[in-house]
């Protein structure tokens, strides 16, 4: 955003403040930075104020409201935890626009590697290169600093830092949790069981806490975008609420940083990656299960089920089972087409009057 502004705006009209910089000990960091900026540059036109990790500033929402109300020439850009949204809603009701920013998608990842895809034909010609980068993406994830870092030991250090920062700053500190060791243990449990169904009673026993406490901890983790839970689809809200949810992680790199074997979990990393991409594209994501058949992802728009997506890394061992589940789901929701995301199988099959598209993950993510 800043680079884009610099194309048409003088740098004297842009102020960036890193609010979690431990070297700065100002009582009112934001106003102090604005005052020093005015003294040094005396900006005459609109000033663009960027505030990073603003949640570290006490009573920041009051400061932002005051600037917004009294200074029409200042445009404010805030970045930080997802938890800011509710506080902004209180301070600036109806006067702000909110964007979720995720780690790089695979398309964005490829751009950083100077791999430019111009249509499906071009993609197929670059298949080997794209598959090579997909393996790196599955292992290290999409956080920009990790993607740009070449040293693997530094990548590991950064991933641990990100994981700890989200957990302690955005979950434990902001939520006032007084048993951080329980949250740390829960984090390890969730990351080792990602893509699986959650059993709150089992987790509660594992942590020696109540199921309600487990629910509260996971809720805080979801608010910080550390994990996402996906409910089972049902037209009955009660059934949705009583059935277990599936858990996914914000980034494969963070998930892998806890020390699990990459190759052993490749199928689940595929599923996590598919979820993250669907989460960028759609607002309502569920899984579906009925009579022993399960479909990984169900996409709903309004009152209508629009898509069913199955993930099957190894079609040779599980493809028939996944296909039968998908067909049953398509029958249930009167869908003519369904998709199975695979390791490297590409096909189009007609089954019982329905079309099943088999697409390898590297292709599905890139088009």
List the model feature ranges, each with a label.
Residues 41-60:
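Conserved P-loop NTPase "ATPase switch" module shared by AAA+ and STAND
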Residues 75-81, 100:
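Structural recognition of the conserved hydrophobic beta-strand(s) that form the central parallel beta-sheet
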Residues 107, 111-277, 284-291:
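Interdomain hinge/linker elements that couple catalytic modules in large macromolecular machines
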Residues 83-98, 113-114:
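Short regulatory helix/loop adjacent to the ATP-binding pocket of P-loop NTPases
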Residues 15-44:
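Short glycine-rich substrate-engagement loop in P-loop NTPases that contacts/grips substrate
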Residues 55-77:
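Conserved Walker B catalytic segment
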């Amino acid at each position: 955003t800043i680079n884009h502004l610099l194309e048409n705006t003088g740098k004297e009209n842009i102020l960036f403040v890193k609010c979690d910089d431990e070297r700065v000990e100002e009582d009112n960091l934001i106003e102090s930075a604005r005052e020093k900026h005015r003294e040094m540059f005396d900006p005459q036109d609109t000033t663009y104020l960027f505030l990073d990790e603003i949640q570290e500033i006490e009573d920041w929402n009051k400061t932002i409201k005051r600037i917004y109300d009294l200074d029409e020439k200042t445009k404010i850009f805030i970045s930080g935890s997802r938890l800011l949204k509710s506080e902004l809603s209180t301070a600036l009701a109806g006067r702000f626009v909110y964007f979720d920013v995720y780690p790089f998608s695979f398309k964005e990842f490829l751009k950083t590697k100077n791999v430019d895809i111009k249509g499906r034909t071009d993609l197929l010609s670059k298949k080997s290169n794209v598959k090579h980068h997909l393996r790196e993406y599955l292992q290290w994830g999409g956080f920009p600093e990790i993607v740009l870092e070449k040293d693997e030991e530094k990548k590991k250090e950064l991933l641990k830092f990100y994981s700890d920062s989200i957990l302690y700053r955005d979950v434990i500190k902001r939520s006032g949790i007084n048993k951080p060791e329980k949250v740390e243990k829960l984090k390890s449990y969730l990351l080792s069981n990602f893509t699986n169904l959650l059993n709150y009673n089992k987790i509660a026993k594992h942590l020696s806490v109540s199921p309600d406490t487990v629910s509260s901890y996971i809720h805080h983790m979801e608010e910080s975008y550390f994990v996402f839970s996906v409910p089972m689809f049902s037209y009955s809200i009660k059934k949705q609420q009583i059935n277990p949810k599936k858990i996914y992680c914000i980034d494969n790199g963070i998930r892998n940083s806890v020390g699990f074997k990459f190759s052993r979990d490749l199928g689940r990393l595929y599923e996590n990656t598919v979820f993250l991409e669907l989460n960028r594209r759609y607002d309502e994501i569920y899984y579906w299960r009925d009579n022993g058949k399960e479909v990984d992802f169900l996409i709903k728009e309004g009152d209508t089920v629009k898509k069913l997506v199955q993930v099957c890394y190894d079609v040779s061992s599980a493809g028939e089972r996944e296909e039968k589940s998908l067909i049953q789901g398509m029958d249930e929701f009167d869908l003519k087409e369904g998709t199975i995301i695979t390791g490297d199988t590409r096909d189009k099959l007609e089954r019982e009057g329905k079309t099943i598209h088999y697409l390898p993950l590297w292709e599905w993510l890139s088009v």
